[in-house]
Regions:
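Solvent-exposed interaction patches of small proteins and small membrane subunits
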Residues: 1-115
Length: 115
């Protein structure tokens, strides 16, 4: 049974909030040299990609309102299947540049659905 679209948006928002909290006040060198930190960030990105991938199955029209949806899901797949080649700088850059905007959009969609 498929979940309510709000549940997927909630999962994505919560994972984004966690990442933003994890990297607050941390520089790239500290991030890259702290396995616990980059493991946690990568896991939360996996959750975002999976949640939004499931959202695209449950409510494709809602999912289309999220820019770069394909890239988000593809990034999740890289983290899951290409784990040996993950570049900390790439993950860091996405967390710093793309994630805040994604978090805003997901929160707005969730709010619009009464969540």
């Amino acid at each position: 049974m498929l979940r309510d679209p709000r549940a997927y948006l909630w999962d994505a928002r919560e994972a984004a909030d966690a990442i933003l909290g994890f990297v607050a006040g941390v520089d790239l060198d500290s991030y890259a040299s702290t396995p616990l930190l980059h493991s946690a960030v990568e896991r939360k990105f996996e959750i975002i990609g999976e949640a939004l991938g499931q959202l695209s199955k449950v409510d494709p029209s809602l999912a289309q309102r999220i820019p770069d949806m394909r890239d988000i899901i593809a990034f999740r797949n890289v983290l899951i299947h290409g784990y040996a080649g993950i570049q900390h700088r790439r993950v860091w850059d996405i967390a710093q540049s793309s994630l805040p905007g994604l978090r805003t959009i997901v929160a707005e969609l969730l709010e619009g659905l009464g969540g």
